[in-house]
């Protein structure tokens, strides 16, 4: 037995597409019987075709201000709540929950994923127990890197809020992402934390990775924006905070702590152990810092450390070393 019918009344909805204004005729869904938390006679959202909402399962479009059209499919026990606009071949199934969102251009949502008060556009997969919460822009785009077919994914138990995730980025495991910008093929996974704020985001770009129990934290002062570029990695229990820029072939691991003012690492730099680096510091070209080494630039001063060099043990550096002294 069908669980809903389409209203006789139609509603014309206009929307922009490819720089042009399009219009579509929609009809409202009306429940024919009680199921789940829906009662017979309840009016829901608006669709352009009965194929949009499956007659089987408990899936439903709850809000009378929601529009779903142009090749979209809602299946299983999926719930669409709040005012949503969903169009252009979006697929929502299983126990997915969408609340107050704009979804379009081939996005796939399944399993127990939650998406709230966000925009999702482009071919991507949001799945598992992942949560995409308030203020996110998920903008997928393929063909911008060598991995031309890789699609943007957020899955497992990852939580993302107030962030912009674009291109082919991957967020998974138990990662937590707040106020961040993640682009291209960057990855955030395991128990990693990206923790920006309403003033400064955390940036993870290109092929950079944050994983393990690593923490990357933005400050609240001007330019306190931690940025990982190219192939930079922050792993294990490392902590990177404030105005830090990590570039080519940089690995920060162990229990290392970096606090920028500004701090820049580039060209095959490895920081591990319990190393600590603070202040206006530039480290470049085959430098390894390990054990309990400390590098701190004095206030109003800068420090340059260029390799090849190894700094380890209990070494404590507070000024640029003389040539050959290390």
Kindly give the residue locations of the regions a language model identified.
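Terminal amphipathic alpha-helical/low-complexity segments used for targeting or macromolecular assembly
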Residues: 1-58, 62-64, 77, 83, ...
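Glycine-rich active-site/cofactor-binding loop and its immediate structural neighborhood
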Residues: 70
